[in-house]
Amino acid sequence: MAEFKYDIVKTFGTVSENDNGWVKEVNLVSWNEREPVYDIRVWQENHEKLGKGITLTEVELKNLKNLLNTMDI
């Protein structure tokens, strides 16, 4: 398995937390020393382990925000 690096540049907040202490967060993350992207992902509390997630560019995040604003929720 290939090794990768990540740096959480900014944490925006927690979406949810499960009973095992894993949290779903919205962060700005630099993967492998690249330009930071917006990231929604499940993390272990200390950020040493991570689960599946999604990364979004600024344009994609703005599009998602616009889409969510049109939803009747």
In which residue ranges do the predicted regions lie?
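Positively charged, low-complexity terminal tracts
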Residues: 1-73
